[in-house]
Design a protein with these regions (language model features):
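Fe(II)/2-oxoglutarate oxygenase catalytic core
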Residues: 1-292
Length: 292
């Protein structure tokens, strides 16, 4: 009698691994079935897609592009613009591949024959002679009406969409060329009334479209980014802080004013010397009023 009980106990002992395997198999099967059912229940039942009701990513994206009712001044299409926030102090954003190579080269071609040494808005006590080393580029001012290719007009319209500021608030494009060794020392685009006198309007933001690649140097720099180097000892000729490397077709937007309309001191910026190659850039200053 004792031997039979022992024999049964041995059989039960030997079958335990099998029982565990069966339990695990049942659990996994149940998990798979429940997951499949939940996934299928989340898919729209509209018959779109291949076998099993699966739908491609393209179909999802296409269906998401719903055109909403818009006002008289709105658009009847959906705009998509990629951007990267480079800084919050100052507020600076980079728009990669903002314009095509063809548009950039068309703008360069239009500007090349009109270039002249770049000038400065002088503050009290400054003269052309004592500021001649501050900005050594050459440039010209162009409006979209002067461009028969339509490239500047296209940039202007897309820029208005990116900034949500009407194109009428923008000054003429300042197209600049920097050759080897040429640069623009750190400065503000904002006109401080204490230095420049009363202003009808202010440059609230600056929009830069890089028209060419630069092999080395030529970065747009923000030495006070993140409130750094603001101890009063900064040399305005130094190329330090946040530096944005020019790349053809990319655009840079930064604000010289806070949303409350006050001056942002961290918006100090400049153009590092070009070490190798040539730098072309189209700058448009955006005003807080459409008259200045």
């Amino acid at each position: 009698m004792r031997s039979k009980v022992k024999e049964q106990w041995i059989c039960c002992k030997l079958s335990m691994p099998l029982v565990l395997l069966l339990c695990m198999a049942c659990f996994l099967a149940g998990f798979y079935v429940s997951t499949t059912l939940v996934t299928q229940s989340m898919l729209p039942q509209n018959g779109i897609g291949g076998a099993g009701g699966r739908r491609s990513l393209e179909l999802f994206e296409e269906e998401d592009q719903i055109i909403f009712e818009h006002g008289e001044t709105g658009d009847d299409d959906i705009s998509e613009m990629r951007y990267q926030i480079l800084s919050w102090h100052p507020r600076a954003l980079l728009f990669p591949n903002f314009a095509s190579k063809e548009k950039c080269e068309a703008i360069i071609k239009l500007a090349r024959s009109r270039l002249a040494p770049s000038s400065l808005a002088l503050r009290k006590g400054e003269t052309v002679e004592n500021t001649k080393d501050t900005r050594t580029s050459s440039g010209t001012f162009l409006t979209s009406k002067q461009d028969k290719t339509g490239s500047l007009r296209w940039v202007e319209q897309k820029m208005a969409r990116a900034t949500m500021v009407p194109a009428s608030h923008g000054e003429a494009f300042n197209v600049l060329r920097y050759e080897i060794g040429q640069k623009y020392n750190s400065h503000y685009d904002f006109f401080n009334p204490a230095e420049y006198g009363p202003q009808k309007s202010q440059r609230m933001a600056s929009f830069l479209l890089y028209l060419s690649d630069v092999e080395d140097g030529g970065e747009t720099m923000f030495p006070f980014e993140g409130f750094r180097n603001m101890n009063g000892k900064y040399d305005y000729k130094q190329c330090i802080g946040l530096r944005v490397k020019p790349r053809q077709g990319d655009a840079l937007l930064f604000y010289s004013m806070y949303p409350n309309g006050t001056f942002d001191k961290t918006s100090l910026h400049g153009s590092c010397p070009v070490i190798k190659g040539e730098k072309w850039v189209a700058t448009k200053w955006i005003r807080d009023h459409d008259s200045w």
